[in-house]
């Protein structure tokens, strides 16, 4: 666990963030939020990414809300003991007291997703009490516009299982106004496909909100990471598959982005 909350680099430095989707105590990776494949032990994987120079780490318990489970604090405590970079934790957050419990377990930032939909005031209350710098609102968005129409994306919750009827761009604006310090934006259409970010979604939300946007969903190669911050205008890029299964290391990603003239933190 780091003692510094929020991004440690300058606002212009782009961050690379490995993501650990966790269920039943194991890191998994799926495609379009389904067909999950085991990727390993979360503590071991977290330690590896810390050693590789990741800027931050995101840990998401992807079935806590849909299963109605409590927070998996023991695993979070173990992960936090192995990393010395900002750790964002999400999944199963239902009330402000859950935010405090996760911070006490070693998290630096808390990601709120489904609970923000059912109780938007939770975001405001958590930000007022703990500070916007440690509140992240996660948005899982699916494109719902037809070909030829203006692009539209809908927010889904409960691990992508429930449609909300909410427009993703408008929701991001609202959450930023309520005090979210960052938006973690995942394209459900691109998740696990390795076909690249939904750059139109990323750029539209990045341009619409005054807080950093973390692009997520679809990274399959190094070029995709660079596109997330150049074309997509994201402040940070999040990936899982290319790291979990040994396709690239965090250092390789940073070296590639630096060669493209993108400001990244190099060890």
From Swiss-Prot:
Domain of life, per lineage: Bacteria
EC class name: lyase
GO MF term set: imidazoleglycerol-phosphate synthase activity; lyase activity
EC numbers: 4.3.2.10
Matches recorded under Pfam families: His_biosynth
Gene Ontology process terms (BP): L-histidine biosynthetic process
Claim: Metal-binding is one of the keywords in the record: no
Annotated localization: Cytoplasm
A Gene Ontology cellular-component term: cytoplasm
Catalytic reaction(s) noted: 5-[(5-phospho-1-deoxy-D-ribulos-1-ylimino)methylamino]-1-(5-phospho-beta-D-ribosyl)imidazole-4-carboxamide + L-glutamine = D-erythro-1-(imidazol-4-yl)glycerol 3-phosphate + 5-amino-1-(5-phospho-beta-D-ribosyl)imidazole-4-carboxamide + L-glutamate + H(+)
CDD domains recorded: HisF
Active site: 21, 140
Keyword tags: Amino-acid biosynthesis, Cytoplasm, Histidine biosynthesis, Lyase
Pathway: Amino-acid biosynthesis; L-histidine biosynthesis; L-histidine from 5-phospho-alpha-D-ribose 1-diphosphate: step 5/9
SUPFAM superfamilies the UniProt entry points to: Ribulose-phoshate binding barrel (SSF51366)
Purpose of the protein: IGPS catalyzes the conversion of PRFAR and glutamine to IGP, AICAR and glutamate. The HisF subunit catalyzes the cyclization activity that produces IGP and AICAR from PRFAR using the ammonia provided by the HisH subunit.
Assembly with partners or alone: Heterodimer of HisH and HisF.
UniProt family annotation: Belongs to the HisA/HisF family.
Protein name: Imidazole glycerol phosphate synthase subunit HisF
